[in-house]
Structures are given as C-alpha cells and as structure tokens.
Amino acid sequence: MSIRIVPKEQLGKEPSEKSISFIPPVLFPNLKNLYQRRAERFQALAKDNPFADYLEFAAEIALAQEKALHDNPLELDLTPLLSQQTGIAPLDKKTFKRSKHWHALLASIIAELQSVVPESAKIALENLSKASETELEEMATALLNDEYSKVSADKSVFIWAALSLYWAQLAANIPGKAKTEYGENRQFCPVCNSMPVSSMVQIGTTQGLRYLHCNLCETEWHVVRIKCTNCELTGKLNYWSLDSENAPVKAESCGDCGSYLKILYQEKDANVDAVADDLASLILDAKMEEEGFARSSINPLLFPNE
C-alpha cells in the first residue's frame, strides 16, 4: 500500500474519520510546541547520557527552530499544487521549487544560536551567515539530493534545521487529506519523499498504530507493524533493545534486507520524541552495526560522512 496526497474534493468514498475502522494514513505536522517539546526531551535525555553535550546542543537547535517558527510564519494555499501533481509527493524534496523563505529561517536560527553554542560551532555559524544566497542554495540542493559529502558536517546540521522547519511549515499548510491506494514505496514520506528518522507506536486516537516520522517535513505516515519498513517483507524481523523487553526504544531489524529502524513506544514512555530519542540511543545503533545491520534512516542532527 502506498499513500498519495489529494485535495479534499478528490477524495473517494473512504471510511468515515469517525468510523472504528478508519486509520489515518497521514498525520500532518502539528507545529504548536513541537520544537519546544523536543528541546525539553533532549534536555531530559541528556541526564546521565554519554552524549550529553551533543544532546544539549541539539536542544538549543530545537529552541532556535521554535523561535524562528514564531518570528517567520508561512501561510500558503497549496490547493493548486495538489491539483497539478498526481501520483507523486507534492513537496518532493528534490523537485519542489523552494522559496527563499528558508533563508530567513536560517538567519533566525543562526542569530539564536550564536550566544549559546560551543566555540567550535560558532565558526560554522559565522561562515554560514557570510555565505551568499547561491552558496546556501548549493548546499541545500546537495543535502536534499542526499549528497551529504558535499556539505561539511559542521554546516549541514544548521542548513537542515532551516530546511526542515521550512518543509514542516509547508506540510502544515496542506489542505488535502491522505488517500490510501495500492502500491509500494511506503519507506519514503508521501509528502516530501524524504526518509524517516524513526517509527513510533502511538497512543491516543491512534492507539497501537505504527507511524514513520519524516526527517524533513515532520509528517508521519502509517505502516503496519510486523512489516519491514524498508523492504516490506515480514519473515525475518527481530527486535533489539539495550535494557529490557519493556524498553521504550527498540531497533527493528530485517534479516531479508539487512536493515534496521528504531521503533519507539509511547505506551512505554509518553514523552518519546522521534528525533530526540533516536539521537539519544546511539549505543543501540552501534550494537546493530556490530550485528551486521545497516541503518535505513537518517537523523537530521547526525548526517552520514558520505
């Protein structure tokens, strides 16, 4: 089953949202307090964590995103875009014609971070603040095209923080709803075609359902449990944790494709965050690599070297 985004008026006869059988295929980002909550989660996870310094640094980035969101609102009518594009992600990260709005977000993030980040990070911020619009666009294009080695690691995290906030603002403006149709490729975000950072088994109105969380636009999309989120096979799945069976963070590995993705359980800890808890459990990543599995996701605060 794949998911595509269509305008409300194009929706066919789907189960009513009030129906017991209705499963929301897509949860668009709710930006109210998202970054504030994420920052608080980073701060909580930093306690007694071997990566405490970096988690506290990540908390500052989330707070800067919250401030940039507040100071740089974005409201767009995306109905024409949804009507023109069928069968593809409406905000595809590689083809969507982005505006310079993300430059303003980056400038705001840089201004907020200058006084709170370590000296080593200040150099990168200063260099970014002096970069031309062309240079910024070149770095953004490289990251969005998965060409991570073209952007130095000390700059990529800030560039992506601005791009992610921009895409999240766009996704939050989508007036259509998601419609489920047969197909493949649920391993990518149906809104922007980026990859997940982790998956989460939720509580509340979506109790027990597993959603993948986009590492770019913050959208979540439904993928059934007991299925590999990378190859969609079901035969060789295993679950790993560092603590116990009741751990709120586990790794779901697939023996068929050799990949793994973190899976978070809100019923075990209602405060889990798709980005923060993934980053705070790097020791689990090391364990999975020792077992011979390759990560099928990217954390927006920790890009690969190549």
Swiss-Prot record:
Keywords: Cytoplasm
Database matches in Pfam families: FdhE_C, FdhE_central, FdhE_N
GO terms for biological process, alphabetical: protein maturation
Domain of life, source organism: Bacteria
Localization (cell): Cytoplasm
Predominant location category: cytoplasm
Tagged with keyword Plastid: no
Keyword rRNA-binding: no
GO cellular component, one term: cytosol
Cystine pairs: none
Any one Gene Ontology molecular-function term assigned to this protein's record: ferric iron binding
Entry-linked Gene3D superfamilies: FdhE-like domain
SUPFAM superfamilies according to UniProt: FdhE-like
The family this protein is said to belong to: Belongs to the FdhE family.
Cited function: Necessary for formate dehydrogenase activity.
Family annotation (HAMAP family): FdeH
PANTHER family: PROTEIN FDHE
Name the UniProt record assigns to this protein: Protein FdhE homolog
